[in-house]
Amino acid sequence: MTLLNRLFIFPLYYNGNTKFMPIHCSDLTEIIYQVISKNIVSHTIECVGPETISLKDILKRLLKITEKNRILIPLPLFLAKLSAVFFQLLPNPLLTLDQLRLLKYNNVASGKYKTNVDIGIPSICKFDEEVEKYAFMWKERGQFSRKRNEI
């Protein structure tokens, strides 16, 4: 969110095609609890959220929920690397080369192992619904951006 707040034009690394299966921390803790209580510790389990979303879709959803207008523009790889090298020089880098390398690969279930859904513990929390709960922090009027009937 820091970059989305600071930049009017937002770079899309790898064209924003990197896929994610975001999982909410409450879903993850429930999975851990169930795995321990049911003694399912002999398996590798990939914990995934209920939906697969591209980086570009995540950014579009964040912008819509936070009521911001930004231009999303694909950034050529050499410029992305150059910006990551520059950002790494800052005390609190907004992007590092390692983060850029990670964006090259999808972060979804590999298919090699069972997922939480396969063992009967599906994720419940949806991305948009959870982000909406905290989005007021990034809206122009902060907590006062909520509609009166929501309070």
What are these regions (language model features)?
Residues 1-4, 89-91:
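Short, hinge-like loop/turn segments at secondary-structure boundaries
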Residues 35-96, 111-151:
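Mid/C-terminal beta-alpha module of Rossmann-like enzyme folds, strongest
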